[in-house]
Curated annotation (Swiss-Prot):
Belongs to the pantothenate synthetase family. (R)-pantoate binds at Q61, Q153. GO terms for biological process: pantothenate biosynthetic process. Catalyzes the condensation of pantoate with beta-alanine in an ATP-dependent reaction via a pantoyl-adenylate intermediate. Pathway: Cofactor biosynthesis; (R)-pantothenate biosynthesis; (R)-pantothenate from (R)-pantoate and beta-alanine: step 1/1. Its EC number is 6.3.2.1. Keywords: ATP-binding, Cytoplasm, Ligase, Nucleotide-binding, Pantothenate biosynthesis. The reaction proceeds by a bi uni uni bi ping pong mechanism. It comes from Bacillus cereus (strain G9842). It catalyses: (R)-pantoate + beta-alanine + ATP = (R)-pantothenate + AMP + diphosphate + H(+). HAMAP family: PanC (MF_00158). This is Pantothenate synthetase. The active site is at H37.
Length: 282
């Protein structure tokens, strides 16, 4: 595995790979890698001749009162996970390397960002789309891999790639969970022991809602109220949202049918956790 820290060297490598016709699987991350990331890397390894992993904590996607400064970082751990999962190139640029001067151009994304985290975190997805435009141009991927834990991000990226005719296939990968159901996340390290126990109720609330849908409930308001009430009863967290939309358009539905997403965000004392399920309802 080769570690690359400059845009110029990474572009030179991927230009040569592209010219030789090799397929490139790209996994963009903010580091502090866990089993969810490892799953993305293994899928990229299975489906491509070359695997590129980027580790970059992107300041553009953090709001003024968010956790940019304390976001967990451990490049030694990330290197080990990368090596264990068959990465060929680890792209590890500094902020100064990615943004040598103030951006004069950013990518604004609309519609799919009007709800869920996009509504709660203004500017977040513009930051995500901007850094991905840069990373896609630097790494020239055939396929790019994203976890469905942030299903809104996947929907936004799919729309952005389609709208700009970017020649990359977006590959969504199912959420990876702990044995007790908690969605794996780099931010889980912020949870206290009690909060870690309470956080299990996030996924449980989604499973209960899924059972109600499978039993025939088709009123989205009843489903989302069920989820909110369950979380508020079983945790000390604050529900940021518990919403149900068509997926991937993220538009309102009057009836639970077709492909839908039920997504939640809950704030604990030091961390905000997200989770979701997607279903196809007949």
């Amino acid at each position: 595995m080769k570690i690359v820290t400059t845009v110029q060297e990474m572009q030179q490598i991927t230009n040569e790979l592209h010219a030789s016709g090799k397929s490139i699987g790209f996994v963009p991350t903010m580091g502090y890698l866990h089993e969810g990331h490892a799953t993305l890397l293994r899928k990229a390894r299975e489906e491509n001749e070359i695997v590129v992993l980027s580790v970059f904590v992107n300041p553009l996607q953090f709001g003024p009162n968010e956790d940019l400064d304390r976001y967990p970082r451990d490049i030694d751990r990330d290197e080990n996970v990368a090596k264990e999962n068959g990465v060929d190139y680890l792209f590890y640029p500094s902020v100064e390397e990615m943004y040598p001067s103030e951006q004069t151009t950013t990518v604004e994304v609309v519609k799919r960002t009007d709800v869920l985290c996009g509504k709660q975190r203004p500017g977040h997805f513009a930051g995500v789309a901007t850094v991905l435009m840069k990373l896609f141009n630097i790494t020239l991927p055939t396929r790019a891999y994203f976890g469905m834990k942030d299903a809104q991000q996947v929907a936004v990226i799919e729309g952005f790639v389609t709208d700009f005719n970017i020649p990359v296939t977006i590959v969504p990968v199912d959420i990876v969970r702990e044995e007790d159901g908690l969605a794996k996340s780099s931010r889980n390290v912020y949870l206290s022991q009690d909060e870690r126990e309470e956080a299990l109720h996030l996924y449980r609330s989604l499973c209960i809602a899924k059972e109600r849908i499978e039993a025939g409930e088709r009123n989205p308001e009843i489903i989302t109220n069920l989820v909110k009430e369950y979380i508020e009863t079983h945790t000390k967290g604050t529900v940021d949202y518990a919403d149900l939309y068509a997926y991937p358009s993220l538009t309102m539905v009057e009836k639970v049918e077709g492909r839908i997403i039920l997504a939640i965000a809950v704030k604990f004392e030091n961390v905000r956790l997200i989770d979701n399920i997607t279903l196809t309802v007949k």
